Amino acid sequence: MQQDSNKKKGKGYRVRPAFARERLNGRTRRVCSILGLAAVVLASAVVVHSLYVIQIRDGAKYRQYAAQQQLLDTTVKATRGEIYDANGITLASTSVVWNIWADPSYSSILYTTSTNDDKTTVRTFDPTMCAEVSQGITLRLLSGDGESLDAVDTSSEEYTQQYQTVYDALSKIDSSYVVLATKVNNAVKLSIEDYVSGFNKAHKKGSGADRIGRVSVSTEKSSQRNYPYGAFAAAVLGFTDGEGVGTYGLEKSYQSTLAGVDGRTITRRNAVGNAIADQNATTFAAKDGSNLVLSLDVNVQEIAERYLTEAVAANNVENRGCAIVMNVKTGAILAMASKPDFDPNTPLDYSANLAYLQEQVAAEPELYTIYLRDENDSKKFKLDENGNKIVDPDPDYTGTYRDILWKNKAITELYYPGSVFKVITSAMGLDSGVATMNTTFTCAGAYGVAKETYHCAGHKAHGTINMADALRQSCNLYYIQLGQRVGSQQFYNYFDAFGFTERTGVDLPSETGLMKYYSANQLGEVQLASSAFGQAMAITPLQMCTAVAAAVNGGYLVTPHVVDKITDTNGNVVEEIGTNIRRQVISESTSDVIRQMMEYEVGNGTGGGKNAYVSGYRIGGKSGTSEQLNMHRRADGDYKKVASFAAVLPADDPEILVYVMLDDPNNARTDYSSILAAPVAGNIISEVAPYLGIATDGEDRSQTTVTVPNLISTEWSNAQVQLNIKGLKHQLMESASDQTAALVTCQYPYAGAKVPYGTTVYLYTDTYDGSLTEVPDVSGKSADFARQMLAAAGLNCVVEGDANGVVQSQSSEVGASVQRGTIVTITCG
């Protein structure tokens, strides 16, 4: 018992020290337990919140991320619509081309690798291998067909530039994407692919090559806009940028119509991002763009451009020229030309017109001078100590040159219309009832208005004349007095009604809205006087055309348009552009009087506009020679001039209007539009009228014989006018050099020859005395077909016998070499 008692007291036993955790009291354990539980709960809350965010709140976003990693979304490009002329001839189309690119970083043949002491890998460029690959690719790029490698001139500048482009791109061995070439055709693309494939096979392991490696070159599909006729209707068609987006002309104004809507293909992709063949791929088909069918006719456009180009060169026109052929009843534009212009296939290239552009810029220093910009604020100019702008000593006119050529002169530039506007002033006076065609005013050669004294051209005194004679003689003083009778308010009301205070609404971009005119309360005595004969209000050529059209079509102002209809890819008409009559400006009876006076102006080759006359047609017209008051003056101190002419036909019931404008002609002989612009309009009419089937004057001249005039030493344009008046056709033959402003040195048939009405006279403006052609065999052909065959050979034709029969004989031996213009008589039966 004693022993047990001692044990209880601890005697004879060693007590073991307690561990730290055993020393924790109960309260501490509870705190720790609570904290641990809180940590677990907090962690769970974080997880739950994350799950909530990922799966519920932002679930859609994360599912999209996951889908993007698993799915490949590829754009399917829509094919841009085409542009056709009125006859269905393609003016703009899209073709498939290829861009060639490379991955130099993956092209191990272009570099060698080594390891530094710090174990980093270093690449060393191999210029020899890069040169070999660059040469192989360049030869194929310049071959055109991928095969004619031997035909490539490796010493040419073109080769050097292309080679350097490829070499520089491939030498970027740390880059994964470099472009070697763009817009490559399929044949060249396949040739490059074959070359690269063969090269890589020759340099793979086991091939025995000195260097083992590969070059990574790939292709990507692209598109290219093509304009098959080059610099043709360029200002109307416009062009697209590198991405295929319309940036000018119809390409811009109808961008959404032509572009279509891109499609998409969604497929699964593998770990490296490539598409996996999958039957469950989702495709949203692209909707190809619609096509534009124009009212513009390539044949009419070609005629207008040809004669305009000749006139610009012959008359040394400094600020370009424009021509318009328009249906006066519908507003449909059959031709619209600005010359010189550009090739929409290469719109950035102005080299063909560089000399012309340099002269134009130099002639207008106030308009085109480039000044230095402030380094701190590019919107401000740098000024000298006197506060004057500092001229850039090394100006870059690239943008200026392109802007000049790209502008559609018919709608983007303002000019003073001059005497063509007298047609409108006449309509104002007639329609308002303040005058009739027989109303007279006196022209004494000078007329004072306020502090200004006005004169007619050449200070002529026309005496007392009526409205018809005033229009024919282009009497400024008559129209000043007529304008005064109309009055400022009424003058402005008609000016506004004829559409001069607003855009025409033509379906082309960049039509200027910065009209320059006087409102009724701004039309003081002087402003009204100058406006009455077209020398105070600035308008666009197309505004003048629509106003003249309204004056002769019964008084209706129509909206001009270039697009006739829109079709889908199958040719079905989606939309048809009808005639839009904006309002009636003058009465039918007033319009009838205007038509009579305009025909009197041309006068069958005897009036003031006689140089626009073409035998066999009833033509009305009016010339206008105006001063460009807002332009830099000529060296002689005189204002620069604008020569214009507006013609309508047939005069009794007009269908078409032909308008020509030459901005700042520098013809040493004259400034008068009746001599410079009227012949251009007449020449256009001489070919356009028969092509369009415009009604003739009804007189049968099939049996008429005409005497060929002597045209030697006559300016070619005047020679053509003489032929137009006599009812003879003309053909200006190509000269050995550009001599469009030269005199006629040879003609055939010769002067004095008696020829049938409608015979073609061939004109030469160089020292060559004639061009030979071979006589075709027309035996057994119908008279009409024989006539066409002979015309194609440059020969004239006289039909004898039964015109409904076939050719029995011909006067010139088959195969004989004769001068162009020779008359071949065929006998039919």
Predicted regions mapped to residue ranges:
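Sec-exported extracytoplasmic/periplasmic mature domains
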Residues: 138-146, 197, 241, 259, ...
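Extracytoplasmic
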Residues: 76-79, 86, 93-97, 175, ...
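Acidic/histidine-enriched alpha-helical segments
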Residues: 149-161, 317-330, 442-446, 510-512, ...
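Beta-lactam-recognizing serine transpeptidase/beta-lactamase-like catalytic domain environment
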Residues: 92, 98, 270-284, 329-420, ...
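Ligand-recognition elements built from short beta-strands and adjacent flexible loops
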Residues: 577, 616, 630, 660-829
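Periplasmic/cell-envelope proteins involved in peptidoglycan metabolism and beta-lactam response
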Residues: 1-392, 405, 414, 489-496, ...
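Soluble non-cytosolic domains of exported or imported proteins
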Residues: 78, 124-131, 182-186, 244-248, ...
